[in-house]
Amino acid sequence: MASDFLPVHRALLSVSDKTGLVELARVLLAYNIELLSTGGTATIIREAGLPVQDVADLTDFPEMMDGRVKTLHPVVHGGLLGRAGIDDAVMAKHGIAPIDLLIVNLYPFEQITAKKDCTLADAVDTIDIGGPAMLRSAAKNFARVAVATSPDQYPDLLAELQAHHGQLSAEKRFALAVAAFNHVAQYDAAISNYLSSVSDMHTTLPLRHEFPTQLNNTFVKMTDLRYGENPHQSGAFYRDVHPQPGTLATFKQLQGKRLSYNNLVDADAAWECVRQFEAPACVIVKHANPCGVAVGTACSDAYEAAYATDPTSAFGGIIAFNRTLDAVTMQSILDRQFVEVLIAPYYDADALAYATKKANVRVLRIPSTGAMNRYDFKRIGSGLLVQSADSLNIHSGALKVVTQLAPTYAQQRDLLFAWHVAKYVKSNAIVYAKDNRTIGIGAGQMSRVYSARIAGIKAADAHLAVTGSVMASDAFFPFRDGIDAAAATGIKAVIQPGGSMRDNEVIAAADEHGIAMVFTGIRHFRH
């Protein structure tokens, strides 16, 4: 089959997206391909002055039920499913002519149901029946039929026709068939997800549950990975069929080696953390934990402060910025340390030119526009956990001062900064911060007080003074020992969720040490 080229004599076009339709029809006619079509598609082709036969004339059966029935006919499906050399006699007996090319895209179900005023009746009316049936018939018979589902496929399809004088290769037909089955599967998944989410069908606008009774997600493989988290594991990177703009899956790699599994995990943590800041910021991540974060007036000073938090851990890290990366900062990074991945929304031309001096460094560009991910997914044994994303940020007006001392303006600014960082540190998470930069980070300890001690050790190792700093904790302190440990290192203000049975003891400890403390009422566990 590898060298099996088949000529296209007859094509059926029935599309909801009319993009490129007339141009496509003209090229097909130039190769003497007979055109069949339905409804509005046929009208547009005919209005362009091009010859086309209505499917209703072919089947000798009119479109009916407001277009619900128009292609569900043996003449159509026989023309798509008939096997060359096997079904020829049967097709001739029943007057069925082969259809060699099918161009169909489906009713826009996802776009219609995304509208706030979409009723259940609107959704049901947008469920395509004839289109998927034809796509499946044509794709099943890829040995003789080619099928396209999107205007994005037209250029390659026409290029193949032109290169082979009106013929299509077996490889092209098979690739198009796979794409068609994937398209139908995605379409059916969207219908299932929508209908499975309807909790009350009797209201004017159907009440929908956030989590459907059956969840069908579709992902597209972007690349195979050298290996998974460890060399003995295999791995691949998939992205959502409709990725959220501004998220990691939309990256463009500008230079460097192939990304690894761990690169992608760390890059996602770094990018999600840095894009929450409004001012120029830098986040350095190692093993999915921030090891240095800072906000500055420019990328250069943000990087310098972030790096100073933990230079040892920054070695081989992933560095992300939320502003255009300039040449000065690029040179500072590459001359100072080994870095696996750099991420920014844009790069100066001089910065990219300097990056070529370290050709193995992976340089990613991700436009920062777009909302954060709406949901998080985590696999467990034979199961999937789904939750709304931890996207809730707090502002100064929502902080509850619970101690005798209230934080100063500068402390309040640093508390909110540290709180934003703590959200991206593995629990139990403790962050020491001062002047919009991290001083020490304690991550992933089973005991919160040990995370606090580690944050202090990190600060001491980096020769950063903790005295006068603030502390953020991703969850409440169950005992006063965490506050006692913080006071011993010189912490002067604390931000935490509150909610412990011993909050009064913890507050009393803060008052004893002259520490200002605020409650957020929000927890930021991260596992």
From Swiss-Prot:
GO molecular function: IMP cyclohydrolase activity; phosphoribosylaminoimidazolecarboxamide formyltransferase activity
Pathway assignment: Purine metabolism; IMP biosynthesis via de novo pathway; 5-formamido-1-(5-phospho-D-ribosyl)imidazole-4-carboxamide from 5-amino-1-(5-phospho-D-ribosyl)imidazole-4-carboxamide (10-formyl THF route): step 1/1; Purine metabolism; IMP biosynthesis via de novo pathway; IMP from 5-formamido-1-(5-phospho-D-ribosyl)imidazole-4-carboxamide: step 1/1
Catalytic activity: (6R)-10-formyltetrahydrofolate + 5-amino-1-(5-phospho-beta-D-ribosyl)imidazole-4-carboxamide = 5-formamido-1-(5-phospho-D-ribosyl)imidazole-4-carboxamide + (6S)-5,6,7,8-tetrahydrofolate; IMP + H2O = 5-formamido-1-(5-phospho-D-ribosyl)imidazole-4-carboxamide
This protein's record includes keyword Hydrolase: yes
Keyword Hydrolase: yes
EC number: 2.1.2.3, 3.5.4.10
GO BP field: 'de novo' IMP biosynthetic process
Gene3D superfamilies found in the cross-reference section: 3.40.140.20, Methylglyoxal synthase-like domain (3.40.50.1380)
Organism domain of life: Bacteria
Keyword list, A-Z: Hydrolase, Multifunctional enzyme, Purine biosynthesis, Transferase
Annotated GO CC locations: cytosol
Domain MGS-like residue range list: 1-149
Pfam family, one: MGS
Domain text: The IMP cyclohydrolase activity resides in the N-terminal region.
Designated name of the protein: Bifunctional purine biosynthesis protein PurH
Record organism: Xylella fastidiosa (strain Temecula1 / ATCC 700964)
